Structures are given as C-alpha cells and as structure tokens.
C-alpha cells in the first residue's frame, strides 16, 4: 500500500484529486486535521509517513512545503512554483522520448500547466522537425474559466451578481508577464 498525502486537500485541485485517488485500492490517503492544515510542523509530521506528497498549494506555500519535505519522499507539485526549476522533472511524458522514464525515476515532479501543456505539445514537434524555427515569434490565445484562479477567485466571482457586462473575457498577460510564459519556453 502506498501512502499519499495531498497537502492542500481542501482546495479546488486537492478536493478533485482526493476524490479521484479515493477510488484506488492500492493507495492510502493520509489525512490532517482541518485546524492543522496550515501548520507546517503538523504537515511535516505527515510528510515522514508519506511515500508520495502531492502539493496542491499556492506557489509560496509549495516552495516552503518542498523545503520541509526535502528528500523524505517523492513529491508532485501542482503549483507553478517548480515547473521550470532545474532540480525538478517536468511532468509531461510526451515532451521527449525519454521524458516518461525521467518522470518514473524522479523524486520531484512538477505538474505541467494546462496552457503550456497544449502549447508545447503543438509547437515543440514542429520545432524539432525543423518545420518551425525556435526563433519564430508566436502568439497563444487562450481562454479559461474562473475555476483556474483557485478558491479565492471562485468565491469572489460566485458572490458577484451575474450580468452580461460582468461575464466578459478579461485580457491579461499581454506584456509576456504571465506566469506560464517561462514554462512555454521549455
């Protein structure tokens, strides 16, 4: 039996992941009391019991958790904090022919973002085959629902009265300052 701790289980991603993993008979999902969810020392005690820790936390909290975990167990990070970090393996098995093996043997795996994943799977093969130059300037137009913004954004937008004017798309990231840009350049 593999012990899994979902750090951030009460968040949007953590809840969905816990629901899916609960169906697996080969996994035991380790729990933490609700009043200890943000207590790093309480979470650290659970890290030592886990074979795998899945971080479903905001970026800074994921960095702090990863430091506390160290080499105690395998870690999968769903945040953007470690996606381009040199000591983490990018969790996109289709990225290269050897990536699946890298992921299988890795101690620290960063979960790819949705936009970068789609972008990389489309553009990278074109560059590798010489069909597209790596220097070509590209634009990625993408739309998302608000759930991608996490619990705070969901709460804010669900409390806002629904009207046509308030439901239009919002433009952002036009100055290449979006958090996924560096990941899309892998």
Regions found by a protein language model. Give the residues of each.
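N-terminal Rossmann-like NAD(P) cofactor-binding subdomain of oxidoreductases
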Residues: 1-172
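Oxyanion-binding "anion nests"
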Residues: 175-186
